[in-house]
Design a protein with these regions (language model features):
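Amphipathic alpha-helical segments enriched in hydrophobic/aromatic residues interleaved with Lys/Arg
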Residues: 101-145
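N-terminal regulatory/effector-sensing and dimerization cores
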Residues: 8-106
């Protein structure tokens, strides 16, 4: 029997209302699915290929990645190795409010080589890691419930 592809996913609560994070390292192929949130993230290692509402998207380590609420997409590694990425998911309306916009906000680049955005994401992930490390075991369990 074939061994299942390597996979590890962690969902992190956040101190920010309407936002949560994920850390994923996986060699799995994901079937078509969607999220009810905006997602903005960073590929940390390997490469990722997906079909999205904007066509085929390839993202390599250092690239930013994004999805819109309801956008159907899939995902798989670009080669036989796993890839690692982190995401921040924003409940609908959070990004628009931050940007001072009325109505719906759409992210138009599913993958990009954007060093400035990558640097800001790394800072946010770092702050989230510090916050996670400061939480008690009881607080972590309360979030998981």
């Amino acid at each position: 029997m074939a061994q299942a592809p390597a996979h590890r996913a962690i969902v992190d609560a956040s101190p920010w209302a309407g936002i949560f994070g994920t850390r994923i390292e996986s060699a799995r192929h994901y079937g078509r699915h969607w999220h009810a949130t905006h997602g903005i993230g960073l590929v940390e290692r390997g490469g990722h290929r997906s079909a999205s509402g904007r066509g085929q998207v390839d993202a390599m380590a250092g690239d930013t990645i994004a999805t819109n609420p309801g956008e159907v997409h899939d995902g798989r590694p670009l080669d036989a190795t796993s890839r690692r990425w982190r995401m921040l998911y924003f409940e609908p309306g959070v990004l628009a409010r931050w940007a001072g916009l009325q109505g719906v906000l759409e992210l138009t680049r599913p993958a990009a080589r954007d060093p400035v955005l990558a640097r800001h994401l790394l800072r946010l992930f770092s702050r989230l890691d510090v916050w996670q490390a400061s939480r008690t075991d009881l607080a972590r369990l309360a979030c998981d419930e």
